[in-house]
Amino acid sequence: MESALCYVNEVDECQDPEVRRLLALPTTGRRLLSAARRVQAGTGSALLKLSLEALPAEPIDSIGELEEAVRAACSFPLLPSILECAALAGAPVMLRAQAPFSALMLRVNSRRMFSWLCRYPAAMQAALERIAERTAGALQEALDSGIDMVSLADPSAMPELLGEERYLRFAADMLVRELHRLEPPRGALVHLCPRASRALEERGCLSARVIEAKPGNYPLAALGMAQREGVTLLGHRCVNCEWSSDTRMYALRLTK
C-alpha cells in the first residue's frame, strides 16, 4: 500500500480502518484530502500532513540492485495527487520527507547499507547525490505549488553508528546539498527535525538564531514568522510537538 500520510516507521495514524480504506484505493487528491482530514481530526493537528514517499517494497540485499533502489527513491508517484490535495485543502499543508541517507536506507537492508558504505563508497555517494538532487526538485515543485511547509528528517543518519567521517560524507553533506537547492517562496518554509539540525550545527554546517515568539501553536506560529520576516529554514524543535511552553524559534542559516 502506498501512503502519502506516513513514513514506514510512523504508521500509527494509518490504523484507522477508514483511512486505510481510502489509501487502498487508487490515489487521487480528493482521497488523500479525505484521509488527511480524518487523521487531522483524530490528532488535533493544526496542519494537514502528507508524506512525499510511498511505502517501499522489501529492501534490497544485493549491490546489483542499488540502481533499482535509487530509481525508486527518485520517483515520487504520489506527488501529483499531493499537489492536487494541497490545492483543495483550504488549510495549511505540511509535506514530510526523508533526507537522502534515510530515504535510501528505507530501500536497502540495513546491514548491507553500512557494509556498502565501506566497500563501495563511490557508488553509494553517487546514489545519494542523485537522491538529494531529485528529492530537492520534487520538494521545490511542491513549495512552488502551494505546500506551506516541508518537514525534513534524517532518522537513520546516526553519527554514533556511522562514525564521523561517514556521517559527514554520506548523510550531513547530502542533506546540506538538498537544503541548498530549496528556495521556499515568501510565507513557506523548510523545517528540520531537531536531531538533524543539531547535528548539522555541531559540525559547522549551519548556524541558528533564536527568535522569541508569542505562545501558541508552534507550526502556525512558524508559518506566520515565515510570512512576516521571510524566514525560510527553521529547526531545533519538533514540528509535531505543536503545543509547548517554549516560545523560542530557531531560524537556521547554512554555513557550508
PLM regions with names:
Residues M1-W116, P121-K256:
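Catalytic cores of TIM-barrel enzymes
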